Design a protein with these regions (language model features):
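Intrinsically disordered, low-complexity terminal tails of fungal membrane proteins
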Residues: 1-68, 254, 465-470
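Hydrophobic core of transmembrane alpha-helices in multi-pass small-molecule transporters
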Residues: 77-79, 83, 152-156, 165-186, ...
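Extracytoplasmic gate region of multi-pass secondary transporters
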Residues: 84-99, 273-332, 337, 341, ...
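Intracellular juxtamembrane helix-capping segments at the cytosolic ends
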Residues: 92, 99, 173, 180-195, ...
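Helix-to-loop junctions at the C-terminal end of transmembrane segments
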Residues: 123-140, 326-339, 358, 426-427
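Conserved MFS/SLC helix-loop-helix module at the cytosolic interface between two early adjacent transmembrane helices
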Residues: 125-167
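C-terminal transmembrane helical hairpin of 12-TM major facilitator-type secondary transporters
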Residues: 320-323, 327, 336-389, 405-408
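A late C-terminal transmembrane helix in Major Facilitator Superfamily
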Residues: 394-438, 448
């Protein structure tokens, strides 16, 4: 079929008729999964007949999936939004280090990590609810994006006027996080419609986007904080985000008509009865408990060994570069014939090994740099597997969107636990450079490695020791 050929979705003019059959588009003819469309009965229409209870149908052309200008524009817009709005809280380790040195924040310094936890935690825990809004009211997905855009930028601007940790928690943490989760799920829904056979590649590219900005943004933020302070830095970030992303808002458009989106929103929940879903969900939950510690505390860990803030930002940057490569690579591999469980265990095994060795034994910049690269590639690569896990559980496109939101939610449990766990793990311990992980960070390093190891073990145990390639 040529690139100009499209599928026709037909709808009744009279609302009391809503018959459904399965429609195939050009993607399906290439062996890709079908997408259900609202269509008429297969009986041909006779122009000379008059049917009192039936109106003449109208047609609406659907554009091809996995290619074409609109598909790529939606994907590139999603890449840019995720790069900026997700990349910013990903650099919170730099902010946390600076906030810890501000005299006004000293009385509440143990609560400073809560700001970063909320800015990302809203995304993780709010994803199922944002996804419900996006599917329940498909006509208003773009409006949902606009609302989230305004809230996120307002959160940063408001944070620049506060002088307390509580103020930062409410603005840079909660308000920004709420805005981002409202942005994210409608965009995920649109990308899910436009990309079918290459879905893993598409979501791998989106996931890698925050790493692309994370390779540069820590240096910019660190320089701004040292020169201008946090208030000017937050205002500059808010203005930059608004200017860079506002022109991209018109790029986001759904592929399917709103009526067909509503039909796809009727999710088949049979995947909840499949043991494999719970196995993957358990692995995501366990891995997420330890996943965030290196992201948040690596610059602080480096400072324990007299590594400068600039070099600490370099470690975050290296991890972000590795994240880009890892998430795109594993997203691409998930579209191929490689077993999903093999990819999952590979990611978790390498992340665990890097944590126990290169992080725990590191007392200098070179070893920490090696850890940043290995952990960034494999631990973040695991996050890309959410789409592949959903497809392994069910072929239904709407189910993939639902499982994606659920897996994001499960990973968010670890994100929320970072603050209280870090306080409990680090508070009673003194820093001793000669000991493993500087003594102060030893429980944190061990927990990070153990959770990745057990996530791999859960999947391996389910397969009963069988060769994963079968």
């Amino acid at each position: 079929m040529s690139a100009t050929e499209t599928t026709t979705a037909v709808e009744y003019l009279q609302p009391r008729y809503s018959p459904r059959i399965t429609g195939r588009d050009d993607a399906a003819e290439r062996g890709q999964p079908d997408i259900e469309l609202s269509q008429l009965s297969s009986q041909p229409h006779n122009d000379h007949e008059t049917t009192p209870n039936r109106a003449e149908p109208i047609t609406q052309e659907l554009k091809p999936v996995d290619r074409g200008r609109d598909a790529w524009c939606t994907l590139l817009g999603a890449f840019a939004f995720d790069a900026l709005f997700w990349g910013f809280p990903g650099c919170y380790g730099v902010f946390q280090r600076y906030y810890s040195s501000v005299p006004a924040f000293q009385p509440d310094s143990p609560r400073i990590p809560v700001v970063g936890v909320l800015s990302t935690g809203f995304y993780y825990f709010g994803s199922p609810f944002s996804a419900m809004l996006a599917t329940k009211f498909p006509r208003y997905q773009r409006q949902q994006i606009y609302l989230g855009w305004v809230l996120s930028i307002t959160g940063l601007l408001s944070a620049s006027f506060t002088s307390s940790v509580n103020g930062l928690i409410a603005t840079q943490g909660a308000l920004y996080g709420l805005g981002f989760v409202l942005i994210s799920m409608p965009i995920v829904s649109m990308v899910n419609e436009w990309w079918v056979a290459r879905k893993g590649m598409a979501f791998g590219l989106i996931s890698a986007s925050s790493g692309a900005t994370g390779a540069v943004l820590p240096f910019i933020i660190d320089a701004l904080l040292r020169r201008y302070g946090y208030k000017i830095t937050l205002r500059a970030c808010a203005v930059a985000m608004a200017v860079l992303t506002a022109p991209l808002l018109p790029l986001f458009k759904a592929r399917l008509p709103a009526s067909d989106q509503a039909n796809l929103a009727r999710i088949n929940w049979d995947f909840l009865k499949k043991p494999l879903f719970w196995i993957y969900g358990s692995a995501v939950l366990v891995q997420g408990i330890g996943f965030f510690f290196p992201v948040v505390f690596l610059p602080s860990y480096a400072s324990l060994f007299d590594i400068s803030s600039t070099k600490g930002a370099l470690l975050v940057s290296l991890m972000s570069i590795a994240q880009v490569l890892g998430q795109f690579a594993f997203g691409y591999l998930s579209d191929k014939s490689l077993p999903v469980s093999l990819l999952i265990t590979t990611c978790c095994a390498f992340a665990a090994t890097a944590s126990f060795t290169f992080w725990g034994l590191a007392k200098s910049l070179p070893l920490l740099a090696i850890f940043s690269c290995i952990y960034g590639f494999f631990a973040f690569g695991f996050g890309t597997m959410r789409v592949a896990m959903g497809r392994a559980v069910s072929d239904d496109p709407s189910t993939v969107f639902a499982t994606y939101a659920i897996f994001v939610f499960l990973m968010g449990v670890g994100n929320i636990l970072v603050g209280p766990l870090s306080a409990e793990l680090m508070a009673p311990r003194e820093a001793v450079r000669e000991q493993y992980a500087g003594n102060k960070y030893e429980p944190m390093v061990i927990l990070t490695g153990v959770t990745s190891f057990f996530a791999a073990l859960i999947v391996l145990a389910w397969h009963g020791g069988k060769v994963l390639l079968k």
